[in-house]
C-alpha cells in the first residue's frame, strides 16, 4: 500500500481540499482528499475485519472467503483509491460534465 501512497498521483491529493471551498464558510473544514482517503482506507480495513469476525461467529452469515487476506487488501485499497480519479470540482464534475459528455 505504501507503494501507492508514495506515488505523485496519490500525493497530489494533499493539495486538494475534500470539501472544496467550504473552509471559507466552515473554518474547520480544512482536511484534504489525502487525509480523507487514508481515513477511508482505515475504515474499510476495520469494516472488512469486522465482517470476517462476524462470518466466523455466525453459521448463517458468510460475507466472503474468510481465509482470503487478498480480499482484505482489495477492499482496503478500494477505500484508499476511491477519490483518486475525480476530475476538477469532484462530484460536481461527475454529475454535470460527464453527464453532458455522454
Regions found by a protein language model. Name each.
Residues 1-102:
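Metal-dependent phosphohydrolase cores
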Amino acid at each position: 500500500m505504501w507503494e501507492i501512497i508514495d506515488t505523485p498521483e496519490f500525493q497530489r491529493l494533499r493539495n486538494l481540499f475534500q470539501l472544496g471551498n467550504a473552509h471559507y464558510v466552515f473554518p474547520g473544514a480544512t482536511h484534504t482528499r489525502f487525509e480523507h482517503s487514508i481515513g477511508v482506507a482505515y475504515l474499510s480495513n476495520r469494516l472488512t475485519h469486522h465482517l470476517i469476525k462476524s462470518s466466523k461467529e455466525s453459521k448463517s452469515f458468510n460475507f466472503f472467503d474468510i481465509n482470503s487476506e487478498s480480499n482484505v487488501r482489495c477492499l482496503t485499497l478500494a477505500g484508499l483509491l476511491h477519490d483518486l480519479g475525480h476530475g476538477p470540482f469532484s462530484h460536481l464534475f461527475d454529475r454535470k460534465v460527464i453527464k453532458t459528455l455522454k
